[in-house]
C-alpha cells in the first residue's frame, strides 16, 4: 500500500454527507446528476512534502489527533485497488479494479480546514484496509453483487451496530458509472472549495499505474451519529458475501470473538483499537 496513491469519493451513499456535517461544503457545487458524488479527495500521496505524504494505514489501531478537542468518527467503506491506464497525453483513459476490500476512512468532524483532505490524514493510523478480495469482473452480475458492508463499534464492552448494513449495489455510483466518474475527476477536477485539483499529484508522481479508491461511506446508525471515537473503543468494518453469511452470523462472529481467531472465506475486515 505504501506505493499506492490513495483517493476517496465524497458523497456516494444517500444521507452520509448530511450526517457527517459536510454537506455545506458542497452547496455551490453543480452536478450533472442529482445523486452524483461531490468530488474526489487525496488521503495518501507518497513522498508529498505535507500531511498527505504521511503513510496513514494501520490495520490494528486508530491513533486519535494530538488535539484532544478534535472529534473523530469511523467511516465504513469499500476500497478498490485499480490499475490505471493513460493515453499519449497522460490523461487517464481506463481504471481496472483488481481487488476490493473493507476500508475505514476515519475523519475529523470539527476541524476548521480549507480542504477536506486535512480532516482525513490526521495521524499515522487514521485509515485501515482489509484483506483483498479478487474481482472477477466489475460489472453487474460480478462478484460484488453478492457483497454487503457492515460495521460495529465496541464501547464499554458492548458491541453496537455502527453503520447501516448495506449491499454494495446501494452505492449511488458503482461499476462502470463509478469508474468513468473517477476517471473524469482525476483528469479534470479543479481546485475549489474543499477539494484539490488532482492532476498535479499524478504529474509529480510520473503518472502512477496503481491507485486505491475508497468509494464512499455508508450512513450511520443512531449510536454512531452521537458517539465520537474514544481511546479503548474497538472498530470493525466487514465486507462479506451475504449469500454465505447472514448479518446475524457476522454479529455472532464478533460476540464470540471468532472473527480474528479463525479463517473466513469471502470476507474482508478491518479491526482497529482506538488509541
Q: What are these language model-derived features?
A:
Residues 223-230:
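Short glycine/threonine-rich loop-to-helix capping motif typified by GTGT followed
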Residues 14, 217-222, 240-245:
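Short, charged beta-turn/beta-strand-edge "cap" motif at the junction between a beta-strand
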Residues 2-205, 227, 249-275:
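Glycine-enriched loop-and-adjacent helix/strand subsegments that border the catalytic/binding cleft
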Residues 9-11, 209-221:
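Glycine-rich beta-strand-to-loop/alpha-helix junction loops that act as flexible
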Residues 149-152, 233-239:
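Short conserved beta-strand and strand-loop elements enriched in small hydrophobics
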Residues 208-210, 230-236:
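Loop/turn positions that initiate beta-strands
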Amino acid at each position: 500500500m505504501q506505493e499506492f496513491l490513495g483517493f476517496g469519493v465524497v458523497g456516494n451513499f444517500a444521507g452520509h454527507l448530511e450526517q457527517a456535517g459536510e454537506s455545506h461544503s458542497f452547496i455551490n457545487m453543480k452536478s450533472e446528476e442529482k445523486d452524483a458524488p461531490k468530488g474526489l479527495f487525496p488521503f495518501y500521496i507518497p513522498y508529498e512534502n505535507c500531511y498527505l505524504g504521511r503513510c496513514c494505514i494501520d490495520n490494528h489501531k486508530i491513533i486519535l489527533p494530538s488535539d484532544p478537542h478534535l472529534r473523530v468518527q469511523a467511516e465504513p467503506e469499500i476500497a478498490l485497488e485499480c490499475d490505471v491506464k493513460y493515453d499519449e497525453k497522460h490523461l487517464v483513459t481506463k481504471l481496472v479494479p483488481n481487488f476490493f476490500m473493507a476500508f475505514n476512512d476515519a475523519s475529523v468532524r470539527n476541524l476548521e480546514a480549507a480542504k477536506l483532505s486535512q480532516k482525513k490524514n490526521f495521524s499515522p493510523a487514521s485509515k485501515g484496509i482489509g484483506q483483498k478480495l479478487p474481482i472477477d469482473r466489475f460489472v453487474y452480475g460480478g462478484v460484488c453483487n453478492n457483497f454487503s458492508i457492515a460495521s460495529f463499534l465496541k464501547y464499554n464492552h458492548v458491541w453496537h451496530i455502527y453503520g447501516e448494513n448495506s449491499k454494495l449495489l446501494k452505492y449511488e455510483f458503482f461499476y462502470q458509472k463509478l469508474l468513468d466518474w473517477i476517471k473524469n475527476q482525476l483528469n479534470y477536477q479543479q481546485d475549489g472549495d474543499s477539494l484539490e485539483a488532482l492532476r498535479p499529484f499524478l504529474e509529480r508522481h510520473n503518472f502512477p499505474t496503481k491507485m486505491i479508491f475508497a468509494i464512499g461511506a455508508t450512513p450511520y446508525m443512531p449510536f454512531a451519529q452521537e458517539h465520537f471515537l474514544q481511546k479503548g473503543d474497538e472498530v470493525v468494518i466487514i465486507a462479506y458475501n451475504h449469500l454465505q453469511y447472514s448479518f446475524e452470523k457476522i454479529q455472532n462472529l464478533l460476540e464470540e470473538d471468532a472473527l480474528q481467531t479463525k479463517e473466513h472465506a469471502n470476507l474482508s475486515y478491518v479491526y482497529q483499537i482506538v488509541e
